[in-house]
Amino acid sequence: MKEEILQKSLKLFLEHGIREMSNQKLVDWLGISTKTIYKYFKNKEDLLEQVLYLYHDGQYEMLLSLSSEQNAACHFFNVWQIAVQTEYNVNHIFYEDLHHYYPELGKKVEGVIAKKFEEHFLSIIERGIEQGAFRKDILPQVALRSVLTLHRAAVRTEDFKRFGLSAENLLLQTTASYIRGLCTETGLDALDEHIQSL
């Protein structure tokens, strides 16, 4: 029952935002009693925290399912393709609510999950440098921070919504352009061929 509550609550938070989903609305949508929700969660913040971990764990599992046998530039592109596709349809109010009403919780969860995500991303960049897919003169941590910043701006704010881009075009016009700049000629050829095959 707890897992079902988490899964359904995650869907509701992502679609409607956090603030919009009061405990009463949650129990109404979930078809359970308030008593049931408090059996598993201390309060809405506790529920939200566990929902955030569920969300990030799911994303991390998707990343690990990608083949690391492919060219690192293509692998790195696929990572961000999944990220954009996943977050593209999330209501931007979800991120605004998290930042505005639950900033400490957002920082806490980010602090717990960030390290494993960043280590995974950095390992792909470093493998790309070793393979010759990425330029040797790039600083992996700076490159990663740039991609993370660009990604957040592209999918978690309204800045790019006005262009009416599909998830794929948003990726190609933002993050993919930056990834192409990290590439050597060999990496760029492989990446362009990979993108054309999609």
Model-derived regions: residue spans:
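Short amphipathic alpha-helical elements of helix-turn-helix/winged-helix folds
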Residues: 8-12, 82
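Short, well-structured alpha-helical segments
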Residues: 77, 122-126, 140-148, 192
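C-terminal peripheral helix-coil segments that are non-catalytic and often amphipathic
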Residues: 123-127, 164-198
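Generic hydrophobic, amphipathic alpha-helix propensity
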Residues: 1-9, 26, 51-55, 59, ...
